[in-house]
């Protein structure tokens, strides 16, 4: 792909507008505008030609259509809830008034636009300029938005077309881009933004410590987190709920309102802004947030909660800052890292895709040449689960955007393998002046994940808690004390046991719940044994609603009285249980015993 360079300068504190160096966007180009907010969509809206502009989501379109500067531009937004008949009505009115078509649509609503154009005898391939804005989203979102790539086949059929972004992905696999040119807008002045990159092994604790500084001024705080569950958890754990508003997708709005949080919105509106404003990836790109003040901006990543909370330093982070048209006060990214993520370069993932293709093609040939239906069915089943299958459309053709999405996601994960990887990625993006500091705590997010793992047994979970308590030792810092509180919230019984008995005795008791409770009772009453001590031990050993053999009852009661030295073991029989429980005689096969109905004494 050939690259053409155009240059822009800073004038009176603002960057030149795109149309000052590029009066119209040429066809068959990927335009890298480098600087957000220099008016690429504005340039196309004002261009004297019919335009269909594809935007990544609805808030962007609604925001552009509502701007006063476009009130005379005949702009029509198309998204869910706008119907083909509405578009046809707009097109007929546009023809009648002799105006240019200016449609902004989401990828999912693109087909409605095509059908409406055909209904009024307009062929987008020859009669309109088709522009994909924030074009990296096609690659980045296609793994969970299948319809985002639907317009692409028609895109290549259009005579007049282009893709634009401040952060385009230009290393594309689709051979149809080979004839495209790459226009690079080169700023001639320093355009880098200051970034505080704070890596840590404990995201929650670091966020807690940073909040007083971020909230200390009168400026609003915008926090970008691409997980509604994580936003909800952070609001609660950081005690920020009453200060917060959340801007997210329609489904996430319903989810938050369903659990009692009412200030959740699917569209940006400055009138709904609170002191703290949480935003998901829906608001990373294209949206214009125009405020009188310059806010503090924070991004939070937790690689152990979800991969999709990772910000790509080359795209996502650049786009986040670009939302604030009047600038920001501070920009901070708090993130943990995971050394378990393997390190590979981009070529490794491309080679893997090629290898996967060779395997798929070989088995597909065997499927086609199969000797009988049984063999063919077997090959078919194998083909469906091969890695390369996810890159194919229903018609068997390659969806190159899904392949690029895979490579892009794997590379983003590599950035989060260790702090220096993330720092170097930010430096490599050339958009930031980076101040990096690493904050380490005794216990972190990886250790917390081990406690929250629901796949392990209770015994294994308690082993992990004891190991972590041993690692903390004496809780000297607020972070240590908070982590112990978190462990107590996860399982207060084992934390109490550790504090009273210690790791060695718990291990000697092999993490037996009954034996640990018994040891704790004896420890508490050491040197001052009483009838209450005996009662606690009996209640710990026996439970109402269960059957016990006479032998087991006598043996356990004898052990209790011998340990506490409160009664001669020789005087104990199985009938002694009636001193503590209402019970009935109940024999099972060859074993005599009692069914314990209820306790006579509660502590």
Residue ranges and their predicted role:
Residues 304-329:
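Conserved SF2 helicase motif VI
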Residues 107-110, 118-156, 160, 297:
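SF2 helicase catalytic motif II
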Residues 50-64, 104-106, 210-239:
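Conserved strand-helix element at the start of the C-terminal RecA-like helicase core
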Residues 71-115, 259-268:
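Inter-Walker segment of RecA-like/P-loop motor cores
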Residues 44-47, 350-603:
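The feature captures the C-terminal accessory region of ATP-dependent helicases
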Residues 36, 40-83, 108, 170-172, ...:
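Conserved Walker A/P-loop ATP-binding site and its immediately adjacent core
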Residues 166-213:
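Interdomain hinge/linker at the junction between the two RecA-like core domains of SF2 helicases
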Residues 289-302:
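A short beta-strand element within the Helicase C-terminal
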């Amino acid at each position: 792909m050939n690259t053409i360079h155009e240059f822009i300068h800073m004038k009176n504190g603002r960057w030149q507008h795109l149309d000052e160096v590029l009066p119209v966007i040429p066809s068959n180009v990927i335009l890298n505008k480098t600087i957000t907010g220099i008016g690429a969509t504005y340039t196309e809206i004002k261009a004297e030609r019919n335009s269909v502009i594809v935007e990544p989501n609805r808030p962007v379109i609604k925001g552009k259509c509502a701007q006063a500067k476009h009130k005379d531009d005949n702009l029509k937004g198309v998204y869910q809830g706008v119907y083909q008949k509405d578009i046809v009505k707009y097109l007929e009115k546009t023809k009648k008034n002799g105006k240019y078509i200016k449609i902004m649509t989401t990828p999912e609503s693109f087909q409605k636009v095509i059908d409406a154009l055909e209904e009024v005898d307009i062929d987008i391939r020859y009669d309109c300029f088709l522009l994909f804005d924030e074009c990296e989203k096609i690659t980045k979102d296609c793994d969970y938005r299948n319809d985002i790539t639907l317009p692409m086949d028609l895109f290549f059929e259009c005579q007049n077309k282009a893709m634009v972004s401040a952060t385009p992905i230009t290393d594309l696999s689709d051979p149809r881009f080979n004839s495209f040119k790459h226009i690079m807008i080169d700023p001639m002045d320093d355009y880098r933004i200051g970034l505080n990159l704070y890596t840590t092994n404990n995201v929650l604790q670091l966020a807690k410590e940073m909040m007083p500084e971020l909230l200390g001024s009168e400026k609003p705080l915008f926090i970008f987190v691409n997980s509604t569950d994580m936003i909800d958890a952070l609001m609660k754990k950081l005690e920020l709920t009453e200060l917060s508003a959340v801007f997210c997708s329609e489904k996430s709005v319903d989810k938050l309102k369903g659990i009692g949080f009412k200030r959740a919105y699917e569209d940006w509106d400055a009138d709904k802004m609170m002191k703290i404003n949480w935003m998901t990836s829906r608001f990373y790109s294209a949206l214009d947030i125009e405020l009188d003040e310059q806010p503090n901006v924070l991004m939070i990543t937790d690689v152990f909660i979800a991969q999709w909370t990772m910000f790509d330093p080359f795209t996502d982070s650049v786009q986040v800052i670009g939302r604030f048209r009047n600038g920001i006060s501070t920009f901070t990214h708090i993130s943990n890292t995971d050394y378990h993520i393997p390190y590979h370069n981009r070529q490794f993932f491309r080679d893997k895709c090629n290898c996967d293709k060779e395997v798929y093609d070989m088995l597909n040939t065997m499927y086609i040449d199969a000797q009988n239906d049984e063999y063919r069915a077997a090959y078919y089943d194998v083909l469906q689960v091969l890695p390369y299958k996810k890159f194919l459309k229903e018609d068997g053709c390659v969806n190159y955007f899904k392949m690029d999405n895979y490579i892009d996601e794997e590379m983003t994960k590599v950035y989060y393998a260790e702090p220096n990887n993330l720092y170097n990625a930010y430096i490599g993006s050339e958009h930031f002046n980076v101040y990096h500091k690493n904050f380490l705590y005794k216990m972190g997010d990886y250790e917390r994940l081990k406690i929250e793992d629901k796949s392990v047994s209770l015994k294994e979970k308690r082993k992990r808690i004891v190991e972590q308590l041993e690692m903390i030792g004496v809780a000297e810092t607020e972070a240590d004390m908070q982590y112990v509180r978190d462990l107590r919230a996860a399982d207060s019984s084992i934390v109490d046991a550790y504090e009273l008995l210690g790791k060695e005795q718990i291990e000697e008791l092999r993490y037996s719940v009954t034996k640990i409770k018994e040891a704790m009772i004896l420890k508490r009453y050491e040197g001052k044994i009483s009838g209450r001590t005996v009662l606690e031990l009996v209640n710990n050993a026996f439970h109402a609603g269960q059957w016990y053999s006479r032998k087991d009852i006598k043996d356990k009661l004898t052990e209790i009285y011998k340990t506490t030295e409160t009664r001669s073991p020789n005087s104990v029989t199985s009938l002694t249980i009636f001193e503590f429980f209402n019970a009935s005689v109940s024999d099972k096969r060859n074993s005599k015993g009692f069914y314990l109905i209820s306790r006579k004494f509660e502590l």
